[in-house]
Design a protein with these regions (language model features):
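His/acidic metal-ligating clusters that form di-metal
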Residues: 1-52
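Binuclear metal-dependent phosphoesterase catalytic core
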Residues: 43-98
Length: 98
């Protein structure tokens, strides 16, 4: 699981300028299960090449807080959302399992 401030997938005007290069690089490594980021306060989610790309909703400029806790299981990742952030279950592809 990787963490970064900027999103790279799905396509969005908040993404890193070289988002395609980074998603291509990450796809080469079967151990990568998820890429978690912020920056886009609206949040976002996509899956590409068996990797979950999760943008956590922002907690500034809103009346309601937003954050999440990720639980890691052998076959899935579970985001327990709080405030504006909704829960999400992300099944791990065979490529990311030990």
């Amino acid at each position: 699981m990787l963490f970064c401030h900027f999103p790279v997938h799905p396509k969005n005007n908040h993404n890193l300028w070289n988002d395609g290069a980074l998603t291509g690089l990450l796809a080469r490594y079967p151990c990568v299960a998820a890429y978690v980021n912020g920056h886009n306060h609206a949040g976002n989610y996509g899956e590409k090449s068996g990797i979950h790309y999760l943008t956590i909703k922002g907690m500034v400029d809103t009346l309601k807080n937003s954050y999440g806790v990720v639980e890691v299981y052998e076959d899935r990742l579970v985001l327990k959302g709080f405030g504006r952030q909704e829960d999400r279950e992300m099944k791990l592809s065979a490529r990311a399992k030990p």
